[in-house]
Amino acid sequence: YALLPWSDMLTGKAARLDMARALLRNTLGERAAALDIALDLPAFGKSGVAAGIDRQLLAGLRAAAKARRLRLSSVQPRLIAELSAQQKQLNDGWLACLDLGWLTLAGIRDGEISSLRNHRASTAEPAILAGELAGLLAAESATVNGKKVLISTSAGAAPKLAGGWETT
């Protein structure tokens, strides 16, 4: 994932896609070249989010659907789906998505995404993962005033956080 900061010079889809490619290349290096990138549709003047999926994985999903005479009409990144569902509820707070090997932290300020961090998790062990999440929250706490953290996990229970964070 990459946060696409608002710029009045980059309002078209092609310009936003170029920015997303550059940001993902900066984060992922050469692996970014293998991604199919999707952009959200932010309101004018607001930052947006780009998500990348491995092209071969997407092609495999499409082929599997076609082999079963199905049509794959949409593949939606979990972070985008979670943001859509929870953004207004959080208002000033954090959304943490814990996936196998990755921790993604989105800061929401005044109902809009204001920061986004991807972190390769060192383990799936809840206590250690809680420490890594707490470290990211501490490092990013200047960007969002809220102490509310919605934790979405693809497997297992959400880790418990110390330090006054209100988790849901």
Place the predicted regions along the sequence by residue.
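Hydrophobic/aromatic-enriched cytosolic interaction surfaces used to assemble or bind macromolecules
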Residues: 1-168
